[in-house]
Amino acid sequence: MKYADEIIVLSKGVQEYFKETYGRKTHFIPNSVNRPQLREANLITDKFGLKKDSYILFLGRLVPEKGIRYLVEAFKNVKTDKKLVIAGGSSDTDSFMEELKELAKDDDRILFTGFIQGTMLDELYSNAYIYTLPSDLEGMPLSLLEAMSYGNCCLVSDIPECAEVVEDKALIFKKADVQDLQEKLQDACDHPDEVDAHKKQAADFICKKYNWNEVVKETMLVSWTLNKMSSEVIKKLKI
């Protein structure tokens, strides 16, 4: 980092951190997404009994900083017949996985799918009622971009990394506040019209805001700047 000519960061929060901590100017070039093909619920119905809009989805690594414990605690007190689908691998944190299963054992609406990929992953994103990311800590949450690109209504914690992505196009709760998360989940389950309104604008918003053309353009600009600097150094050294 000390000797880097240029630094690229994925979020404005990290950009501010580098500025305040190291006095370094950085280039903010976020992750991006393409609009995916939506898929009907076939594989997930056969394997898990899931149908369109029948579940709330979390998808990511099962680690403490993702806030999954809050999500399970909050969901257990939500009055709904929808399921909570927690999809993802334990990422070498088997003890945390066991803790989550112990916490969820009395609620048969909570489903742990394990690691998911391919067509089944597409189906989970395509048919969720809402997608939730209750994280305490994030960089640039690619799963959130992906969820919105599928046209999902998203419920996220109010950490800067999530808030700067969704702006006013998603539902937001107070980080680590189980009661507030429960109320937001309940409200979403009770008001499908509001959920639908968020769904209708999610994909267009996120694919326009985070598109690959801009990423390529900005990255090439950084590369061009580096090449120009290198050429000037070579000329001065007469190499």
Map each language-model feature to its residues.
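Short alpha-helical donor nucleotide-sugar binding micro-motif in glycosyltransferases
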Residues: M1, F115-I116, E123-A128
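Carbohydrate-associated surface elements
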Residues: G13, S32
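Glycosyltransferase donor-sugar binding loop
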Residues: V33, L59, K83-E98, G114-F115
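A conserved mid-protein helix/loop that constitutes part of the nucleotide-sugar donor-binding site
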Residues: S54, F58, V63-N77, E98
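Nucleotide-activated donor-binding/catalytic signature segment of Leloir-type glycosyltransferases, i.e.
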Residues: M97-T119
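Aromatic "clamp/platform" in nucleotide-sugar-dependent glycosyltransferases that forms part
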Residues: D136
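Short hydrophobic beta-strand element within catalytic cores of glycosyltransferases
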Residues: S149, C153-V156
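Conserved acidic donor-binding segment of nucleotide-sugar-dependent glycosyltransferases
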Residues: L171-Q179, D187-D193
